[in-house]
Amino acid sequence: MELSSAEAVSTRFLGLTQRSVSEDLGCRRGEFSRKHYGSVELLISSDADGAIQRAGRFRVENGSSDENTGYTPGTWHRTDVHLENPEYYTRWYFKYFLGKVHQNYIGTDSEKNPFFLSVVLSDQNNQRVPQYHSILWRKTGTQKICLPYSPTKTLSVKSILSAMSLEKFEKGPREIFHPDIQKDLLVLEEQEGSVNFKFGVLYAKDGQLTDDEMFSNETGSESFQRFLHLLGDTITLKGWTGYRGGLDTKNDTTGTFSIYTVYQGHEIMFHVSTMLPYSRENKQQVERKRHIGNDIVTIVFQEGEETAPAFKPSMIRSHFTHIFALVRYNKQNDSYRLKIFSEESVPLFGPPLPSPPVFTNHQEFRDFVLVKLINGEKATLETPTFSQKRQRTLDMLIRSLYQDLMPDLHKNMLNRRSFSDVLPDSPKSTRKKEEARQAEFVRLGQALKLKTGVKGDAPTTLATTSFCKKEPWESQSFCSNFPHEVVCADSWGQSLLVSTDAGILLIDDGQTTVQVFDKTLQIKQMHVLEALDYLIARTDKGKDSRLLVFRLSSVQKDIETKQVIRSKYDCRENKLERTKGCHLYAINTHHSSELRIVVAIRNKLLLITKKYNPCNSLTGSSLSLSESPVEEFQYIREICLSDPPVVMTLVDGPTGDSDNMICVAYRHQFDLVNESTGESYRLHHIEANKVNFVAAIDVYEDGEAGLLLCYNYVCQYRKVYPFNGGSPLIQPSAYDFHFSWNQVPYAVVCAFPYILAFTTDSIEIRLVVNGNLVHTAVVPELQLVASRSDIYFKATAAVSGSSHSSSKEMSSRSSPQTPTAYDMLECSLSSSEGEVACKNLYKIPLSNLVGRSIERPLKSPLTPKVVTTPTSSGITSLPVTHSPSLSRMEIKEIANRTRKELLGKLPLFFSVYISYH
C-alpha cells in the first residue's frame, strides 16, 4: 500500500492536533435524563367557589427550562421526530409470513399454557440476507427473534424455542398444516393495536374551565379552523369508504363532516367537538362526550392569552382519555405552543418537546404533533389497564384456537422436526401432494394479505414516507474498497487508527493510508486518549499478551518525520510489565477526575491509575519529556474473582472517593466489584441455559450511575445507588426496565437518546428511555470497527462510483435528493450477482446522534406538505397537498383487477404486490 508524502502527512496531522467535536461528546454520551420527558404533578381542578372537583396525577411536558436545570447547553437537546415501534418493522406476520411458505407449530409449556410458533426463511428486505424470522405467540404477548441461516447447519424447532427461553414443554410442538391457521394468527397479531387512529379535538374558549362549557361550543374561531385545516382534510362522512374511527358514514348521526388525514401510512380520523352533533337542550352534550371521551388521546385547542387560566386534564370527566395535548395559537408571531399531559401510568414516549415548545413552522408543528400523539396512544396500550385486557383477550383466543385444533393433532400434524430451509424435503410419493398443499397455503395467504390491505388495516409500508429524509444515524462513506481484516480501531481526531492483519494503519477520509506499526504488532484492543496524549493498547494473545502505553505526540512525530515504521520489538519500553497474560482491559470512559484502567489477567483484576504530576509540560520535567509514558502509571491493587470476566466496565461513583465500581460478567451473572475493598455483589442473575454476554454500558441519569446489561436478546437497565456502609444499594427501582432485540447483537453502542445494536447483517436502533424501536437498517456482512467517539463500521458493497465519495463530500452536497450510505448499500446489493463485492468503511458522526441543540427549523419526518412535481416540459410545477392515501387507492385498483383471479390461479402482479409489502 502506497504511503503518503510528507506534505500530505503534515496536512493530515493538522486535524489530529485539533480535538474533534465527537471526542468532546464521547465522554458524556452516556448522560441522560428522563426530565426531558416531563415530570409527574398532582393536578387539581376546582369550581367557581374554589371547591375541589377532581384531581389526578399526570406527567406534564412543557419544554420549560426548569426541566433542563444543571445541564450544559447542547448536551442533550434532541428534537428528531420518530414514530416509535413502527408497524413496518413490528408486524412481522403480515410482512414476512403471509403469502409465503412457512411453518406454524402448536404446543403447551410446562404450565399447560398453549403457544404457537411461526417460522419462515426470508430474505431481509430483498437484500440477499437469508434469515429465519420466528414469532412465539403466548398469552403474555408475542416474542420475535431473527436467527441466522446457515446452509450447512440445520435448525430445529427445539433450538428456536430454546433461543426464546422456552425449554420445558408439557406437549412438544407439532406442525399445523391447515392453511386457515394464517387467518387466526393474523388476528393474534392485530391484538397489538390498530394501525389506524382516532383522536379527539376539543375547542375551548378563553376562560372556559369545565368540560360542559367546552363541549357546548357550537362553532370554533378562525384560528381553530386554520388549525383543523393544518391537521388534515375536511371529508364528507356520508358514503366515506376509508377509516371512519367509529363515526357514522351512512345516516349522518355523528355529524356531516369530519377531519381526516394519512400520516406515514396511518389513517387518522379526528373527532372534532364542533363537528359532532350539537344539542341546545342537552347541556352535557352527551353525543360529543361519547366520542371524544372514549378517545385515548385528545387535543385541546384553547383560546386566550398564555397568562389566562390554563387547561388541566382534571377538568375533563373521562376515565378513558390518558393523554391531552394542549395547543395555543399566538396571532402576534403566527406560532403554536404545545403542552402534553400524560396519565402517570403511561410509559415515557417521544419525541420530547423542544425548549421552548413554540413552533413557527406550521408543517413541522403538524409533523411533531401527529408523531407525538401516535406514539402516545401506543404507549398507553402498555399501561396495566390495557395490557391486562389485551392479555385476557390473547389468552382466550389462543386457548380457543388450541381447542379447535386438538381433534386434528394426530391426523393432520407431524411431530417436532428439524428443518434447514423454508421448503422441507418430502418423499417422492407425497411430493405432489405437498406441493399442492403449499400452493393452496400460499394462495390463501396472498389473498388474505390483499384483503387486509384493501380494508386499510395493513401495517404501514415505507411507500408514503420520505426515503431521502436525513436521519441522525445516516452514515457517510469513509474509505472505499478497504481490503484488510479489521481487529479493532479507535478515532484519532478526524482519522481512524485501525489494527489490521497488515499492521496498524492510520486512515483519513480522502487521504492516503499511513502505516504506523508493522504487522508484527498485533493489537486486540485500543484506546486513543487525545486529551491525555496516550495510546493504550492490548497486544498479542495468551501468555504473551501485554498492555502497551504510547505517547500520541511521539507516534505523530514518527509519522511526520517518516522514520522507520515501528515493529513489535520497538515497543519494549512501552510495556506495563505486570500486565503479562491479560485477556481484557477497560478504562473509565466518562469525565471523572483521573484515568483508571482495570486489566483482567485470567480471574485477577489489576487496578492501574495515572500518577499525579503537579508539574505541567512547560516545566521541562524529565517525566513529562519521556518518550515512553510507562513511568507515569502506578499499580493500586489486585482483586481476585471466582472466574475470568468476559465483559468488564468501570462505573464512576458519585464522589469518586472509595465508591468507584467495576461491573464484571461471567458464568450466568453480572457482579459489581468495589474498587477500594475488592468485595463483589450480585447485580443480576440470568435464568438461561446458555448466556452470550454482549456488553455492560455505564450510563449516568442525572448524575447517578446505572448500567445497561446486554446479553442474548436482552438489554436490561439497572440503576446503581450510592454505597452505604461499604456496599452499593442494589435494589429494584421503578426506573429499571428491559427490552429485547430482534436479533442477537455482538456489540451495543449507547449514544443518547439512541442505543444501537450491531448484528451480523443489521443495525437495530432504539431509544434508551423506553427501548422502543425507531429504525432497522439492513447492512450485509456488517462489522463494527470503532464506537468510542464517532461510529465506524465495515460492510459489503458492490464496486461503483458512488461508493468512492468521501464523507466530507457527502456532507457538503447532502440534499433531499442525495441517497444515504444505506441507500447506496441497498441499491448496490440488489444489483446483478456478477458484480465484484468489496468491503467499505462507513462513519456515523457522533455529533449527529447526540450533539445537536434545539434550533429552528425542527427536523421533519416527512416531505413537506406542498412539494413541486416537474411536468413534461420541466418548467411548470404543480403543488401537491396531503390527501387520502394513494396506497389505498392503488390497492383498491389492484383488487378490482384481480377479483376474478382470486378464485383461480395466482396472477403475476399479485406476487409483485405481496413482495412490495
Swiss-Prot record:
Keyword annotations from UniProtKB, A to Z: GTPase activation
A GO MF label: GTPase activator activity
Coiled coil feature spans: none
Domain Rap-GAP: 185-401
Pfam family, one: CNH
InterPro entries: CNH_dom, Rap/Ran-GAP_sf, Rap/Ran_GAP_dom, Rap1_Ran_GAP
Any GO BP: regulation of small GTPase mediated signal transduction
Domain of life: Eukaryota
Domain CNH: 483-792
SMART domains named in the record: CNH
Family: Belongs to the GARNL3 family.
Protein name: GTPase-activating Rap/Ran-GAP domain-like protein 3
Biological source species: Gallus gallus
Annotated gene: GARNL3
